Amino acid sequence: MKKIFQLAIMACTALSVHATDYTRGLSIWFDTPNTLVNKAIWFGNTSDMWKGETKPESAGDTATNPDAGWESQSLPIGNGSLGANIMGSVEAERITFNEKTLWRGGPNTSAGAAAYWNVNKQSAHILDEIRQAFINGDEKRAMLLTQKNFNSEVPYESWKEKPFRFGNFTTMGEFYIETGLSTIGMSDYKRILSLDSALAIVQFNKDGVAYERNYFISYTNNVMTIRFKANKPGKQNLVFSYEPNPVSTGKMETNGNNGLVYTARLDNNQMEYVIRIHATAKGGTLSNQSGKLSVNGADEVIFLVTADTDYQINFNPDFNDPKAYVGVNPSETTATWMKDAAALGYDALFDAHYKDYASLFNRVSLSLNGSGKTDNIPTPQRLKNYRKGKPDFYLEELYYQFGRYLLIASSRPGNLPANLQGIWHNNVDGPWRVDYHNLSLIHI
């Protein structure tokens, strides 16, 4: 009887780490893991043509992202400044990382940025000629009239010019967390994005151990928090590493026995940025060597990540000043954020994060046809069924709420608005430079 009681306790303990079923709430989830096949996608393409840069990159200036898994199966999290995509592979977690103000390139004109504002203010009457050219089917004349009369002193840009005149949003690199595990013998895999709490979760069972990872980016503390845990002690054997943006030059330094600081500048415009990483472990050992944080035999591990650039928002810039948008010391800002976040710990960070996020997300609820969630299946299966004509009002509710989630995660007070991809990108360059556009009428 005593033995049966002990086995029952062990069984309950084995389930405790997965006690919360995040798929039951408003969530997007998958039941198969991703792989590392497209990690650091920029190294698999053509060489860069920008003057002074020789490192490999992919321009990615088409509508097709070369990393299809990142685009369709990763879990996006963000706080309006920092963004990350969680891939959720078992062998090694891959996290693409972004900071909204990291911008590659610039005006690229000897006259300076002010030249862009020197436009022909007496061009309205030319509109009649342009319209008539279109009516006559003379698109070439319409284009030439537009370029000549509705442009600044800076020559009209060519889509394929190198460097592109206005530059582009660019990745801040990728993080990898090697686990020493494999998918052999793995079961009950789930990769979940909880829209209710802006929390990403990875869960699976392996060799009788229930593993769980949690990820969120806090607006209140400007830090990404990552937690690895299991239902049995001593199971966390991890190596945390960083792959930097390939068109930047930087240096990784240790910060005590549990921290890393990467300081860099983009190669073409010298924008400075800093990334700070901090680790804490319950049990086991933690070492810091060769730009990597290694954990052995820990019960639980917390990684904190924050970043910043030298960009300063300026609503009244002097365009003759090349430093009009420079004014932040990213080494100082990131040090303050990291110190404050590390002092709080996981629970306090998540509580503040959830309270802030829920105050926005919970303003709106949506119920279509009084449906509710009638079945609990992975999101790809929902989409597959929907394409076959099966009604799914919950999927439509989820789609609407996912849009709200993405905007909250990519646009918050105190920073730039969301760009064409919100705040998330996995490459050096991207479709339409991942920049800022007014909405075209054809897209409405």
What residue spans do the PLM features occupy?
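Bacterial Sec-dependent N-terminal signal peptides
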Residues: 1-20
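Aromatic-residue-lined binding/catalytic grooves and analogous aromatic/hydrophobic interfacial grooves
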Residues: 20-441
